[in-house]
Design a protein with these regions (language model features):
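An N-terminal hydrophobic leader/cap segment in hydrolases
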Residues: 7-55
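Short alpha-helix in the alpha/beta-hydrolase fold that links the catalytic acid
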Residues: 96, 202, 211, 225-234
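Acidic catalytic loop of the alpha/beta-hydrolase fold
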Residues: 219-224, 248-250
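Post-His helix in hydrolase/transferase enzymes
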Residues: 252-268
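Short beta-strand/loop motif that positions the catalytic acidic residue
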Residues: 208-210, 215-217, 221
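Membrane-embedded segments
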Residues: 60-137, 141
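Primarily recognizes the serine-hydrolase "nucleophile elbow" in alpha/beta-hydrolase
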Residues: 134-189
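Catalytic histidine neighborhood in serine/cysteine hydrolases
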Residues: 230-251
Length: 273
């Protein structure tokens, strides 16, 4: 047997082993909850957080609701559901979302199954079930206008809110530093698409979503490349792309500009006045 045939055989074997390992451990890579741990994070003083638990068939998940500043004239106002990145917890994101409440928007943070104090195991199926339960609870609140529920996801959270948008109506989508889909991300590492267990196909959801979409992405993002953001923008029917000079974990670089852009988008979408 020629030497080159042996080398090809070894290469094929190595690739097969690589694919098997990726298939076996992909959820540990996508959902690195074991590396996060649980240590309480200091929250802003006097923040009126309502904490409660949501039950699904596979998990009991922690959720926090921050009511808006002031009350709408008719007693019902807009609300937002937030989904964090894969290496975060809801308490780490709470403080940075407070400006939404100053805009008159209630904020619901939903933990992923298996993260923090929530039970269960994270997967697209279990996360979607948790967010559907959260949405239904939020839409039933006496102080929430169900026609003005916004979905906001960052990084992996973009997949969570897109999966929710495929099952429940939303007034608008905000996708920050997120991907077109896990299969597209996996292809960078030569992983076959059929081996992806949790595809989070954001591109298909965005393409079919009829409402306004705000895409926020850093031009220098080396974790989820910038072209994912531009592809999502082109696929959406009504989308705005906010391109910032930043990477993945430092986006947005200018908080004041970011919140000005957010407020403008929400006004144009008819969420706030």
């Amino acid at each position: 047997m020629p030497v080159w045939v042996k080398y090809i055989g070894l290469a094929v074997l190595a690739y097969a082993v690589y694919c098997i390992l990726v298939f076996a451990f992909q959820r540990q890579m996508i959902f690195p909850r074991s590396h996060i741990g649980y240590a309480p994070v200091a929250l802003p003083d006097n923040l009126p957080i309502e904490k409660f638990w949501l039950n699904t068939a596979d998990a009991t998940v922690e959720s926090w609701y921050i009511p808006p500043t002031g009350s709408p004239a008719d007693g019902r106002g807009p609300a937002l559901i937030f989904a964090h990145g894969n290496a975060e917890r809801i308490d780490a994101s709470t403080g940075e979302l407070v400006p939404f409440t100053a805009l008159g928007i209630g904020v619901l943070l939903v933990e992923y199954p298996g993260y923090g104090q929530s039970t269960g195991t994270p997967s697209q199926k279990s996360i979607t079930a948790a967010f559907v339960a959260a949405y239904d609870m939020l839409a039933a609140r006496h102080d929430v206008d169900p026609s003005k529920i916004v979905l906001y996801g960052r990084s992996l959270g973009g997949g969570a809110v897109c999966a929710l948008a495929a099952k429940r109506s939303a007034a608008a989508l905000i996708l920050a530093s997120t991907f077109t889909g896990i299969r597209a991300m996996a292809s960078r590492y030569l992983v076959p698409a059929f081996m992806v267990r949790d595809p989070f196909d954001n591109l298909t959801v965005v393409r079919e979503f009829s409402g306004p979409v705000l895409i926020v992405h850093g031009r220098h993002d080396d974790i989820i490349p910038f072209h994912h953001g531009t592809t999502l923008q082109k696929a959406a029917r009504h989308a705005i792309l906010l391109a910032y000079d930043c990477g993945h974990n430092d986006c947005p670089p200018d908080a004041e500009r970011f919140w000005r852009d957010i407020a403008n988008f929400l006004r144009e979408a008819g969420i706030i006045v």
